[in-house]
Amino acid sequence: MAASGEEDMSELSPAAAPNLDWYEKPEETHAPEVDLETVIPPAQEPSNPAEPFCPRDLVPVVFPGPVSQEDCCQFTCELLKHILYQRHQLPLPYEQLKHFYRKVPQAEDTARKKAWLATEARNRKCQQALAELESVLSHLRDFFARTLVPQVLILLGGNALSPKEFYELDLSRLAPFGVDQGLNTAACLRRLFRAIFLADPFSELQTPPLMGTIVMVQGHRDCGEDWFQPKLNYRVPSRGHKLTVTLSCGRPSVPAMASEDYIWFQAPVTLKGFHE
C-alpha cells in the first residue's frame, strides 16, 4: 500500500519529512488487507472505575522499518473498529455487520425478501451506525492524505474534555514516508494486534453501557481540512481510563515536529453504539 516518497510529499501539507538515510529497504511487499477484528473476542470482565492515567496502560509496538502514510491510516481505522467491538459498542465485528446488515435478498426471492422487510425497521439503527462509522473512516483516509498525523484519540462516553475511557494512538515516532517500498501492511497489523492481545487491556474493564464515541486527530494547522473541525485550545484529558498504543520504527528517533504547527481536529459526528 505504500506510495512513493515523491507522491507522498506532493500530497501532504507543509510538515517536513523525516530523514530515512538509516533505513535499508525491506524485501517485503504489501499483502491484501486482513480482518483482524475476529482474532480477539470481546473481553468478559469485572470492573475498573474511571481513574487517573496509569503508566502501565501502555502498548508499545516497534516495526522493523518505516511504513507509509496510508498504512498509518489503516492502523487507525482498524484500531477504531476493534475498540468499538471490544467495548461492546458494536454487537459484531465491523466486517460481519456490513455483511449481515447490508445483504438484501434478490427481488425474485419473495419469501426471504418479506422476512427481511419485516425486520428492516429494527435494522435501521444498525444501518445508521454503520453509515456514520463508514463516513468517519472515509474522512480519516482523506485527512491522512492531507497531513502527517502525530496522534489520534478515540474517546468513549462523557465528552471530548472528560471521557469515561480514551484510547491514544501515538504515531509521532514513525517515519511514514520517503521510501519507495514500505513494510507488509498485513504483517504490521498482525504485529499491532498481537501486542494488544498480549497486553490484554480490556479484560479488567466492566462491560459498559452504550456510549458515544468521539474521534480526535492531530494534523497540520494549514492542511486545508474542512470536515474535521479544528479545536485550537484542546488538551488531552488527564482523567478517565486510558490506553496508549505507541508505534515506532526502530532507530533513529524521528525528529520532533514543531508543536505549534499541529493542532487537534474533531470529527463532527459522534458515533453511537447499538445492541441487537
Curated annotation (Swiss-Prot):
Has UniProt tagged this entry with the keyword Nucleotide-binding? no
Amino acid composition bias (Acidic residues), ranges on this chain: 1-10
List, alphabetically, the Pfam families matched. Answer: p31comet
Q: Which domain of life is it from?
A: Eukaryota
Q: Lipid metabolism: present as a keyword of the record?
A: no
Region annotation Interaction with MAD2L1: where it falls in the sequence: 49-81
The record's section on InterPro entries has: MAD1/Cdc20-bound-Mad2-bd, MAD2L1BP_domain_sf
Residue ranges of the TM segments? none
Q: Which GO terms describe its biological process?
A: deactivation of mitotic spindle assembly checkpoint; mitotic spindle assembly checkpoint signaling; regulation of exit from mitosis
Q: Where does this protein reside within or beyond the cell?
A: Nucleus, Nucleoplasm; Cytoplasm, Cytoskeleton, Spindle
Arranged from A to Z, the UniProt key words for this protein are: Cytoplasm, Cytoskeleton, Nucleus
In residue numbers, the region (Disordered) covers 1-30
What GO cellular component is one of the record's annotations? nucleoplasm
Functional description taken from the UniProt entry: May function to silence the spindle checkpoint and allow mitosis to proceed through anaphase by binding MAD2L1 after it has become dissociated from the MAD2L1-CDC20 complex.
Q: How does it assemble?
A: Interacts with MAD2L1.
The record's similarity note reads: Belongs to the MAD2L1BP family.
Q: Please give the name of this protein.
A: MAD2L1-binding protein
Tell me the organism.
Mus musculus
Identify the gene encoding this protein: Mad2l1bp
